[in-house]
Amino acid sequence: MIPQVVTSETVTVISPNGISFPQTDKPQPSHQSQDSLKKHLKAEIKVMAAIQIMCAVMVLSLGIILASVPSNLHFTSVFSILLESGYPFVGALFFAISGILSIVTEKKMTKPLVHSSLALSILSVLSALTGIAILSVSLAALEPALQQCKLAFTQLDTTQDAYHFFSPEPLNSCFVAKAALTGVFSLMLISSVLELGLAVLTATLWWKQSSSAFSGNVIFLSQNSKNKSSVSSESLCNPTYENILTS
């Protein structure tokens, strides 16, 4: 069976048993438009990967700051769950590796790299969702911690002896601690939300790339090729189709 290049909008494939399969033929973009689209897509991937790496650095830096904060009776329990979960460190690692791998995959588009980028993007999505949940709980717990801090200071301040012996911090220190933690949690939450959106976008791009670029489409076999054991493939003019000829 000799394949014919059909220029009309409808392509009809007739099999040896006489059954026809009509298919719609979509107009293919020109080479210039394809090259322009590829360049635009590569630029977008680079920008998203760079922002992912920046988010990773931000989350990691804020996590280090929280880990180095001295222990506080009322506020340590607020961010201890965040540190014990390991999100500022493990999540930042996923974000950074995902961004770096996206840059590498954009330069060298291979099937293993595309699948690895897709897997890291999915892990980044799950990690960002976990971090957003923990940070939301931590932000909600700041107000009760502030009230406990104020109450403890008020109780100590009513007793002069206790005031002189324990020398409690000024009441403003409770507000300063709450404001500082609110700022840290807010920056980390913004970075996590941004990372979530970017991870979803990159995962979608790599999923489409892995589905379209590495999958076969149509196989044409002649009737006398049933007893052949090997076939060879060659590309047609239309890159979305494959012509399988008997060797």
UniProtKB/Swiss-Prot annotation:
Residue intervals on the Cytoplasmic side: 1-46, 102-121, 202-247
Keywords, sorted A to Z: Membrane, Phosphoprotein, Receptor, Transmembrane, Transmembrane helix
Membrane-topology annotation of the record: Multi-pass membrane protein
Topology, Extracellular side: 68-80, 143-180
A Gene Ontology cellular-component term: membrane
InterPro entries with a match to the protein in the record: CD20-like, MS4A
Modification type Phosphoserine: residues: S235
Subcellular location: Membrane
Tissue expression summary: Expressed in thymus, spleen, intestine, colon, testis, heart, liver, brain, kidney, peripheral lymph node and bone marrow.
TM region(s), chain numbering: 47-67, 81-101, 122-142, 181-201
Function field: May be involved in signal transduction as a component of a multimeric receptor complex.
Annotated family: Belongs to the MS4A family.
Name of this protein: Membrane-spanning 4-domains subfamily A member 6D
Upper taxonomic lineage: Eukaryota, Metazoa, Chordata, Craniata, Vertebrata
